[in-house]
């Protein structure tokens, strides 16, 4: 600033002191940011002296003080100050505006850069999200296409099943019509058969003769290879006598035989005081694995009962409903006895139709029949299911499929009602219980008669086949030595 002031003072001093050059003029050539010369007249250059001063470029940053005399100095001062100040103000204003604009631009550019970065980041995220959504859309389209295919397949299956059901319904209706016609035919034939039977009975009654039931085969078609017959062993033909049995239902006294030793080798009687259990299988599961007398109470029964549980046969848990061992108990009984049961639990006994019905209908049971002949040979017949219908259906027998080595002599009785001497429900014109001397699910009449007369020695002589026989094993003229009927829940 001091240098600039000193320079201006020298300049004005030279302008005032112009004695050796009259009427001369001078021009100051200022070198600024934009340097330009002043044009001079060629004529005057020849007459006048001209001085050119090179002044270093300075920027006026404060007030300028000029001390000079005369009108020319004042004019020059005004010219310099006004022009420079105006120029400086313009420059400063312009630079300030530019600086402000640049500052705004810088700020805006910074914000824009940040926003651009954020937008780029968001763009990348959006692109990734759009890609994910696009992939999900493709998966959904594929899944819906698969679902539509599955739906079409299911619809086709439903249509096929519906068609089959309609066909089955049509066939069922046709079968119903055929069944109704066949039922009418059977009823008509039954009426005709009944009339013919009555006529035959009247004819036979006039002739004072007796109708005997049909006899089963004396020797079975299929005999076990190890079986040996002893036709010479013919014992007496007597039925067991029971002192408490009504005399009017007893057969003649010449049909009895004395008891023999039990072939099943019953151990000393064991009484189990725990319980009651619903069957012998439940007792075995409770830890009782010894054969003996147990207290059993079936579901929905009025009270408990005592019966024999057989655990010696693997795997045990068998409930014995009938047992024949030595002929000590009379099985030629009436309906009430067979309904309630009779005999000795540790020997021969019949559990009772009502008790058997309660047991067999509380669960799904199977039936095992063990047979023993007089040669100590044991065979068995097992049926996959067993149950009785209620008394209103006269304890109708329902059996499953057969397996075993004794032959199937029980299936012929499947679906038949129980018959006793005083309740005839068999398919024969007469009373099968009268001829076979015991209660059973007779057809017309029997292929098995396990409640018949116990004969010693095997083969027996009798007018009717009234022994304990299994037609497919030893035939109808061979009385077995021992029999057990047992049931157990299906595994």
Swiss-Prot record:
Localization in the cell: Secreted
Tissue distribution: Highly expressed in adrenal gland, placenta, thyroid gland, heart, skeletal muscle and small intestine. Weakly expressed in testis, ovary, colon, pancreas, kidney and stomach.
A GO term, aspect molecular function: signaling receptor binding
Keywords recorded for this protein, A-Z: Coiled coil, Disulfide bond, Glycoprotein, Secreted, Signal
Any GO BP annotation: blood coagulation
A GO CC annotation given for this chain: extracellular exosome
Signal sequence interval, chain numbering: 1-23
Glycosylation sites noted in the Swiss-Prot or TrEMBL record: 160, 188
Principal localisation: secreted
Top-level taxon of the source organism: Eukaryota
Gene3D superfamilies membership: Gamma Fibrinogen, chain A, domain 1
PANTHER family reported for this sequence: FIBRINOGEN ALPHA CHAIN (PTHR47221), FIBRINOGEN C-TERMINAL DOMAIN-CONTAINING PROTEIN (PTHR47221:SF5)
Protein name: Angiopoietin-related protein 1
Record organism: Homo sapiens
């Amino acid at each position: 600033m001091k240098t600039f002031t000193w320079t201006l003072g020298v300049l004005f001093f030279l302008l005032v002191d112009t004695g050796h050059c009259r009427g001369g003029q001078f021009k100051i050539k200022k070198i600024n940011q934009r340097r330009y010369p002043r044009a001079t007249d060629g004529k005057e250059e020849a007459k006048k002296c001209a001085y050119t001063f090179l002044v270093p470029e300075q920027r006026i940053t404060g007030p300028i003080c000029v001390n000079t005399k005369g009108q020319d100095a004042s004019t020059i001062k005004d010219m310099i100050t006004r022009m420079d100040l105006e120029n400086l103000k313009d420059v400063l204003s312009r630079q300030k505006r530019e600086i402000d604009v640049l500052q705004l631009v810088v700020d805006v550019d910074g914000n824009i850069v940040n926003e651009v970065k954020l937008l780029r980041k968001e763009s990348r995220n959006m692109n990734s999200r759009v890609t994910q959504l696009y992939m999900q859309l493709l998966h959904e389209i594929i899944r819906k296409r698969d679902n539509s295919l599955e739906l079409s397949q299911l619809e086709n299956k439903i249509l096929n099943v519906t068609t089959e059901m309609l066909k089955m319904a049509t066939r069922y209706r046709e079968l119903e019509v055929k069944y109704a016609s066949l039922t009418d035919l059977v009823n008509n034939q039954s009426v005709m058969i009944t009339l013919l039977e009555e006529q035959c009975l009247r004819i036979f009654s006039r002739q004072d003769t007796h109708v005997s039931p049909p006899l089963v085969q004396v020797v079975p078609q299929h005999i076990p290879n190890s079986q040996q017959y002893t036709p010479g062993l013919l014992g007496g033909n007597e039925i067991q006598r029971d002192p408490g049995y009504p005399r009017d239902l007893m057969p003649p006294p010449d049909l009895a035989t004395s008891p023999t030793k039990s072939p099943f080798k019953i151990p000393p009687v064991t009484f189990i005081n725990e319980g009651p259990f619903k069957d012998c299988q439940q007792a075995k599961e409770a830890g009782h694995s010894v054969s003996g007398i147990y207290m059993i109470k079936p579901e929905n029964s009025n009270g408990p009962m005592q019966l024999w549980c057989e655990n010696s046969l693997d795997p045990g848990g068998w409930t014995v409903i009938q047992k024949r061992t030595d002929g000590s108990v009379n099985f030629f009984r009436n309906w009430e006895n067979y309904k309630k049961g009779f005999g000795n639990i540790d020997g021969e006994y019949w559990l009772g139709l009502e008790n058997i019905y309660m047991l067999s209908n509380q669960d799904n049971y199977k039936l095992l029949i063990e047979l023993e002949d007089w040669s100590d040979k044991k065979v068995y017949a097992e049926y996959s299911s067993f149950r009785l219908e209620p008394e209103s259906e006269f304890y109708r027998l329902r059996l499953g499929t057969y397996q075993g080595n004794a032959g199937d002599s029980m299936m012929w009785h499947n679906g038949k009602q129980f018959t006793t001497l005083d309740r005839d429900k068999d398919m024969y014109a007469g009373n099968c219980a009268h001829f076979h001397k015991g209660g059973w699910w007779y057809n017309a009449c029997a292929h098995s008669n396990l409640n018949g007369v116990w004969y010693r020695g095997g083969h027996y002589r009798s007018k009717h086949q009234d022994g304990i026989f299994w037609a497919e094993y030893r035939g109808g003229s061979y009385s077995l030595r021992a029999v057990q009927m047992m049931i157990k829940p299906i595994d």
